[in-house]
Design a protein with these regions (language model features):
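Glycine-rich, basic loop-to-helix element that forms the pyrophosphate-binding segment
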Residues: 66-86, 107
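GHKL-family ATP-binding catalytic core of two-component histidine kinases
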Residues: 87, 101-102, 190
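Acidic donor-binding segment of Leloir-type glycosyltransferases
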Residues: 24-68
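The conserved acidic donor/metal-binding loop of glycosyltransferases
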Residues: 95-99, 123
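Conserved donor NDP-sugar-binding/catalytic core segment of glycosyltransferases
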Residues: 103-156
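N-proximal low-complexity "stem/linker" segments adjacent to membrane-targeting elements
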Residues: 1-28
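Conserved nucleotide-sugar donor-binding catalytic segment
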Residues: 76, 149-216
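Short aromatic/hydrophobic "clamp" motif used to bind/position activated sugar donors
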Residues: 91
Length: 216
């Protein structure tokens, strides 16, 4: 693995400028610093997206018209515009209404550097409004995904295998075939692998799950 690899953070956005600023603040607060920011503006009419001050220290892809409204493109296809101009060794995804905890990238880069894996994701907290470190938020995997998916797996329930804070080392195809345990804003993936795959397919929904299956 490359020492101190560059991470391109791809953020699609449409008319959610104030949310986007919170997302960008969380990127700026990362303890891992070798980062480039790539924003894909999907035809927003909020003029704050187009100011010189906003453009500073970012790569911005401004799409003239909203691609979802015109062509029916899903969010995966919008991310592809950012992937195309990204120069990082890794691509990390962040939606404009999500934020990261400060050590998110550092932790994942460290884990990837000690393994043969080319992609990493994490659990995520579910909540609304500004993050409050003193508040208890439900987690997506333990509080939602594992409890919702009670179908049998290998003859036993998912909860049998995924006890609290004892997550699997990796996801297999059978798990992904049942439902999606991976939140896109938690993903970091090797850029070469993603480019070899051709990025996300143009699907109206579930393009992210389709992509994760292709990674396997």
């Amino acid at each position: 693995m490359i020492k101190n690899p560059k991470v391109s953070v791809v953020i699609p956005t449409f008319n959610r400028f104030e949310y986007l600023i919170h997302a960008l603040d969380s990127v700026a607060s990362q303890t891992y610093k070798n980062i480039e920011i790539v924003i894909v503006n999907d035809g927003s009419d909020d003029q704050r997206y187009y100011t010189d001050s906003f453009k500073k220290n970012k790569k911005i892809v401004n799409l003239e018209k909203n691609q979802k409204l015109i062509h029916g493109f899903g969010p995966g296809s919008i991310r592809n515009f950012g992937i195309d101009v990204a120069e990082g060794d890794y691509i990390a995804f962040l939606d404009d209404d999500d934020i990261w905890l400060d050590h998110k990238l550092e932790f994942q880069i460290e884990k990837l550097s000690k393994s043969e894996f080319k992609m990493s994701n994490s659990d995520a907290f579910i909540g609304e409004g500004k993050f409050n470190s003193n508040q208890r938020y439900p987690s997506y995997l333990y509080d939602y995904y594992f409890k919702k998916n009670k179908e049998l797996m290998y003859g036993k329930s998912l909860n049998y295998y995924f006890k609290k804070y004892q997550y699997p080392k990796y996801w297999d195809f059978m798990t992904l075939a049942r439902s999606n345990p991976i939140i896109t804003s938690t993903v970091i993936i090797e850029a070469n692998l993603l480019n070899q795959m051709g990025g996300f397919r143009n699907l109206p929904f579930a393009a992210d799950l389709d992509c994760w299956k292709a990674v396997l």
